[in-house]
C-alpha cells in the first residue's frame, strides 16, 4: 500500500528522458543495429529507419523497443542533474516515479533506479497518465507536481486534474526543437534540472 505524506507536497516524476537519458542510449542501440532515428517528429513511429532509409513498421518498432529495454534498461545513463536534484527535492516532497516502461521490464527499471541511488516508490503505467495522477491526487489531497517530457502526458494530466502543477521538462535539445507549443498545457517549461528545483521549491 502506497503511503503519501499529507504534510508534504507530492512530486510525480517520469523516468525516460526525465531521469534516464533515453534517446542517447536508444540512438546508440539503434546505430549498433544499423538503424537510426531521423528526428522528424515527437514520436517513434515513422522516425526509426533502416540503412535503406525505410521506416520500420509498428511491429518492428515494438520489437526494437522491447529488445532495447531487455538489454539496456539497467545500464542507461542518467539525465544530467537528475539523481542529485531528486535527492534535494525529496527533503521537502514525497516523490513517486511513474513510467510508461513496458510492464515486463518493471524489475529491470527498479534495478536501474536502485543502482543509481534513486530509491522512491516506482510504478509502471501504460497509455495516458492522467487517470493514475488523478488517483494519486485523490489520495493525497495536497499540492502535487508532475514532471514529464511528453506534451501529451502533460495534457492528459491537466484534463483529469487541472490543479496538478505541471512541468514539461525536455533536456534533449533535439526533442525540444520538435515541440511546437511548449506552454500550451503545462504550467512551466524547463530544460534543466536546476530550474525544476527552483520552480518546485519557490
Where are these regions (language model features)?
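Short, basic/glycine-rich phosphate-binding loops at helix/coil junctions
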Residues: 52-69, 109-115
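Active-site neighborhood of HAD-like aspartate-dependent phosphohydrolases
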Residues: 1-63
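Glycine-rich phosphate-binding loop signature in dinucleotide/nucleotide-binding domains
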Residues: 5-7, 91-93, 137-144
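Short, charged, surface-exposed secondary-structure boundary motifs
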Residues: 130-135, 175-184, 198-201
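Short acidic-hydrophobic, aromatic-tinged amphipathic segments that line or gate anion-handling sites
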Residues: 121-126, 185-196
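Acidic, Mg2+-coordinating phosphoryl-transfer loop and its flanking beta/alpha structural elements
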Residues: 146-191
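Substrate-recognition element of Asp-dependent hydrolases with the DxDx(T/V) motif
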Residues: 73-77, 82-112, 122-125
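Substrate-recognition "cap/lid" segment bordering the active-site pocket of phosphatases
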Residues: 102-145, 151-159
